[in-house]
A protein has these predicted regions:
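Second-shell loop/turn segments in exported
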Residues: 75-76, 113-121, 136-141, 195-205, ...
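Extracytoplasmic/secreted envelope proteins and their assembly/folding machinery
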Residues: 85, 124-132, 147-151, 155, ...
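Extracytoplasmic
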Residues: 64-66, 81-86, 95-100, 126, ...
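Amphipathic, coiled-coil-like alpha-helical scaffolding segments used for oligomerization/assembly
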Residues: 121-179
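C-terminal solvent-exposed extensions
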Residues: 66, 70-73, 77-78, 84, ...
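Entry/capping segment at the start of metal-dependent catalytic domains
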Residues: 11-97, 193, 295
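Flexible, polar/acidic helix-loop-strand segments at domain edges
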Residues: 155-232
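N-terminal post-signal-peptidase region of extra-cytosolic proteins
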Residues: 55, 67, 71-76, 84-88, ...
Length: 300
C-alpha cells in the first residue's frame, strides 16, 4: 500500500478516536460557557480536574506552538484495572489540524509489551513512558478519562437511547434486547459492567456504544444556538471534573479555545494496524515506523 493510500485509509472515522475527541469538545464547551455560567464555577471545574503529570514537557501555548496530548481512557472492568484506549494527539496551528494516533491497547508492541499489561503494573505513568519511548516525542499535556464515571456525563447531558443487542441483568437492572433508555449514572454504569469472564468483548462494545451516544449529546450541545439554564451547564461542568483528570489548566483552556479552536475542529486519524501471530495481535516495527513518520509530519 503506497503512502497516499495509507494516509487516506487512516483518515476514515474510527470509533475510539471519535469517542476520545469528546474531551476536546468538552473543553471548548466549558470555556465558552463562561459568558453564561459564573466565571468562578468554570475556573473551579478546571481546578478540580487539574492533576500534575511531572514527566510532561512544558510548552508556552500563548506562542501558538504545536502541542501534544496523551489521552488515556481507563477504568475497572469486573474488578480489574483496564486501559480501554490510548491516543496521542498533535494540535498544530500552522496546519489548522489535530491528528490523533491510536494505540491498540491489547496488541503486543515492538517492545514485546501491551499497553494493558503496562497499565496493570505501572498505571498511567507506565503508559506515558511507553508511548514516549515508542515514538521518541515530547508529551506536553495529559488527559485521563475514568470510564467508570462516564455515566455522570450521560446523566448531565440528558441521557441516551440506544440499541441493545442482547438481554442481560447487571447490578439490579434489567436490560432487554432492543431499544434501551439510559438516564442515570447508575444505569449507565450497570450497562457497561462486565458480567463474567466471557463478557469482556461484549462489555467493551457496550462501553464504545455508550461513548458514541454521549458523543452525539456533546455535539448537539456544542451546536446549540440557545443557551440552557445555569443548572444545566453547572451539572455538565461537575460531571466533567468528576470524569476527567488533566494538566490542562483553566488558563491553558482559555488559550486553546482562542488560538487553537480551528485546529481542534479539523481532525485526522492514524491507526496502528495489527497482524495475527499465533493467535495474538501484534504491531510490527515496520508498521510503527510508518505511522510514526506520519505523526512526526503532523508536528511540523
Amino acid at each position: 500500500m503506497n503512502q497516499k493510500k495509507r494516509r487516506h485509509y487512516r483518515k476514515k472515522k474510527h470509533t475510539v478516536l471519535k469517542v476520545i475527541s469528546i474531551i476536546f469538545v468538552l473543553v471548548i464547551i466549558a470555556v465558552a460557557s463562561i459568558a453564561y455560567v459564573a466565571y468562578r464555577n468554570v475556573e473551579s471545574t478546571f481546578s478540580t480536574s487539574y492533576e500534575n503529570f511531572p514527566k510532561t514537557t512544558s510548552i508556552d501555548l500563548k506562542k501558538s506552538k504545536t502541542f501534544t496530548t496523551l489521552i488515556i481512557a481507563t477504568g475497572k472492568n469486573n474488578s480489574k484495572n483496564t486501559a480501554y484506549a490510548t491516543v496521542l494527539a498533535s494540535t498544530n496551528v500552522k496546519t489548522n489540524q489535530t491528528t490523533f494516533m491510536n494505540f491498540p491497547v491489547f496488541a503486543t508492541m515492538p517492545n514485546q509489551k501491551t499497553i494493558t499489561e503496562v497499565y496493570n503494573t505501572n498505571g498511567d505513568d507506565g503508559i506515558f513512558q511507553m508511548v514516549k519511548d515508542l515514538l521518541n516525542v515530547s508529551i506536553n499535556k495529559v488527559i485521563q478519562i475514568d470510564v467508570n464515571k462516564m455515566g455522570s456525563l450521560v446523566q448531565a447531558t440528558g441521557g441516551i437511547t440506544m440499541q441493545n443487542p442482547k438481554a442481560f441483568n447487571a447490578e439490579g437492572y434489567e436490560f432487554k434486547q432492543g431499544t434501551v433508555n439510559l438516564q442515570t449514572a447508575d444505569q449507565v454504569q450497570a450497562y457497561m459492567t462486565q458480567i463474567d469472564d466471557t463478557d469482556l468483548d461484549a462489555s467493551i462494545t457496550r462501553i464504545q456504544n455508550v461513548s458514541m451516544e454521549l458523543y452525539g449529546n456533546i455535539q448537539k450541545i456544542a451546536h446549540m444556538k440557545k443557551l440552557e439554564s445555569f443548572n444545566y451547564y453547572r451539572e455538565i461542568l461537575y460531571a466533567f471534573s468528576n470524569t476527567v483528570k488533566t494538566n490542562i489548566s483553566f488558563n491553558d483552556a482559555k488559550t486553546i479555545v482562542m488560538s487553537y479552536n480551528t485546529a481542534l475542529k479539523n481532525t485526522s486519524k492514524l491507526n496502528l494496524h495489527t497482524t495475527d501471530e499465533n493467535g495474538a495481535k501484534v504491531v510490527s516495527q515496520t508498521e510503527l515506523d510508518s505511522v510514526k513518520t506520519l505523526f512526526e509530519k503532523s508536528l511540523k
